[in-house]
Amino acid sequence: MLHFKRCQLLKQIAQKCLSRIHVKTDKHPQLFLSRTFALAELRKSWHSIYSLVGDKNIILMGPPGAGKTTVGRIIGQKLGCCVIDVDDDILEKTWNMSVSEKLQDVGNEQFLEEEGKAVLNFSASGSVISLTGSNPMHDASMWHLKKNGIIVYLDVPLLDIVSRLKLMKTDRIVGQNSGTSMKDLLKFRRQYYKKWYDTRVFCESGASPEEVANKVLSAVKRYQDVASETFISTRHIWPKDCEQKIPAKFFSEAVIEGLASDGGLFVPEKEFPKLNCGEWKSLVGATYIERAQILLEKCIHPADIPAAKLGEMIETAYGENFTCSKIAPVRHLSGNQFILELFHGPTGSFKDLSLQLMPHLFAHCIPPSCNFMILVATSGDTGSAVLNGFSRLNKNDKQRIAVATFFPEDGVSDFQKAQIIGSQNENGWAVGVKSDFDFCQTSIKRIFQDSDFTGFLAVEYGTVLSSANSINWGRLLPQVVYHASAYLDLVSQGFISFGSPVDVCIPTGNFGNILAAVYAKTMGVPIRKFICASNQNHVLTDFIKTGHYDIRERKLARTFSPAIVILKSSNLERHLHLMANKDGQLMRRLFNQLEEEHHFQIEKILVEKLQQDFVADWCSEGECLAAIHSTYNTSGYILDPHTAIAKVVADRMQDKTCPVIVSSTAHYSKFAPAIMQALKIREINQTSSSQVYLLSSYNALPPLHEALLERTKQQEKMEHQVCVADVNVLKNYVEKLAQNQFIGKFSE
C-alpha cells in the first residue's frame, strides 16, 4: 500500500531550513544550521499541522476548476506539511499515463472504478490531499478517505467554475457525454459533494486562492473546536474569576431543553456569524434551500448536526411540502412596498417555515433512550404547524416524541380551531383552554420550572418535557433564513442593488418573527428599520415608544388578528439581552419584576438604543378591514388581517426612501369571515371550507391554498379536549398523554 511517510514532511522542513543558510566567505561557502534553530523549525512546522488536525488529513473536495490543487499547496506551505494531489501523485503514477489519456482509453464508468481502486490502495496521515473532481462519485474510496480525514467542500460559484475550465481549455470531464453541457454536469455532481463533506468553504465569486486557503483553515479549526459555539441563558450571570463558571450548553442541548433552568431563553454565547459582501452576492442566484443550507451551516456546529445531515433535513423540510417552489417568495404590491409571502406551507402560516424543519433538528438531537413530550402554547397558527411538522417524522421518531398543544378555546378563529383540532394525529393532541394565550404560555413555563413534576414524569414514564414555541432556539433560528432570502430576492429581481437598505414591517406579538429579522441583520443583511405592527392590544408598540412594559391594567381584546394577541412577549427578552451587552443580571431583574409586578421600565440609554432601529405603531379593527378592502380594489390582492395591520402601520411609519418588505404571515383563507366582512360580502352561516370556496371565486391574489382547503374538509368533524384555566389541570393532561403514549414502550 502506498503511504506518504512523515519523512516527506521532514524533507520539506529541511528544505525550508536550508533556504535560511549563512555564507561565511565567498571563496569557501559553509552552511551553518544550528541545532536549536533546526529543532525550533521542526517543532513549529510539526505543531502547526498536528495541533490543528492531529493525524488526520485535510481533504479538499470540489468540482474541476475549484482550485483544490492551488489551495492545497498554499495550505501545505502554511502548515509545513505534505501536500498530495490525487491526479498527479496517485493516479498518474499508478497508471503511468495522464488522467485525460486514461479517461479516453477506458471511458467514464471504467475510469471511475479504476480511479476508486487507486485511491483505496493509498493511505496518508497529517497531509493536505486535493481530490479529483470525480472522486466523490465512488463511495468505497470516499469512505476510505473519510476514516482519517476532514473533508472540506470548496463551494465555488458555478459561473466561476465554467470560466476557469474555459481558460484551462478543459472540454471534457468524467461523466460528460455528447449533448451534456458543462454547466448541467457540474450541477449534477453537486449531489455527490453534498453527500461527503464535513465542512463547507463558501467561496464568493472572484476569491483568491490565498483567501480560500485561509477560509479552509478557519473552517477546519471550527470543525475541530467542538466547544467553540455554545449557548447561555439570557439570565446567565457571568461569574467572577474566583467563582466556578456555569457550563454553557451546546446547540443540541438548547434545542432539547427549550427553556433554560433559570427561566431565561437560550442565546448564542458569542456573536452571530457574519457573511461578507461577496458571500451574500453569491447567494443572490441561489434557491431558498441552497440559501438555508449555507446560512444554517454557519449557525449550527457540525458536531451537533453534521453538515450533510443538516442538508438532508433542509431538503426534506422544504422539498415538497410547500405549494410554491420558491418557498417564501417576494411579490411587489405597489410603490415601494413588497409582500413576503410566508403562507405557502402545509398549514398556511409563517410558522411552517420553521416547524417543517425544527422537528427534524429535534429528533436528531435527542438521545435515543428517552421519550419526549413537546408542550406548545398557541395563539392560533403555531398549534397546527407544530402538529403537522412532528407528524412528518419517521415512524421510530414518532414513537418517542409526542406533542401536546394548548390553545385559548375562544381566542382563535373558527378556521384556526378547526385546523388545530384536525391536525391531531398518532403522536399529537390539542387541548382547548378556557383562557387566553398568555395563560397557556405562562402555564407551560411554570410546568417546565416545576422540578417535582418533571422529575415525576421522568421516573414514572421515562419522559422529558420540551417546547416547540419560538422560545426554543431550534424553532427561532430557521426564521432568520426567510428574512435574508427576501432581501436577496429583491436584488435578484432587480429592484435594488446589493448593499442598498430596506425596511421590514412585521405584525408582532411574541417578538420572534421580528427578532429573526434582527439576527438576519447581524449576519450582514442591510436592514435599516424594523417596523413593529400591533393590533389594538398594543403592548409592544407602547414599549418601543416609551421603554415601559406595562400590563397592569391591560385586558386582551378579541381581534381579527388573534396570532398577535399577546401580553407577555417572550422573545423580547432575547433582544433586550442583545442590546444590553448580555447583561443577565438585568434580565433577571426586569423579567422577575414583570412576573411579580406586571411591568418594568428600561433605562433611557436602552430606550434610545432600541429606537435607533425600531419604530412601532398599531392599527384599529376598522383600519384593518379598510386596508383589506382598499388593497383588493387597487391591486386584486387579498391581505389576511395580520398582514393588513402591517400594511397600515407601514403606510403610516415608513418614509418611502427605501423599499419596505411587509411580512405576510398567514393565508387570508384562514380568516374568511373577516375577509368577507372587509370585502362587504354578505356573510352566510357557512362552514369554513364553504367560505373559502366563496372567496376563491373572486380569482384574487394570492391563489387559493389547495392543500389548506383539502385538510379543512376533514377537520370540521373532529373532537378535542377542553379544560379550565388551572395549571394543575394542564399538568394532569400532560401526565395522561405521557401515560397513553409512552407507558407501554417504557415498561417493555
Language-model-detected regions and their locations in the chain:
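NTP-dependent small-molecule kinase module
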Residues: 24, 28-53, 74, 78, ...
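A glycine- and Lys/Arg-enriched "phosphate-lid" helix/loop adjacent to the NTP-binding pocket
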Residues: 147-191, 686-697
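Glycine-rich phosphate/pyrophosphate-binding loop at beta-loop-alpha junctions
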Residues: 167, 385-444, 491-498, 503-594, ...
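Catalytic phosphate/nucleotide-handling subdomain of diverse soluble enzymes
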Residues: 391, 525-542, 648-716
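Glycine-rich phosphate-binding loop used to anchor ATP phosphates in small-molecule kinases
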Residues: 110-148, 643
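Conserved substrate/cofactor phosphate-moiety recognition/catalytic segment
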Residues: 77-116
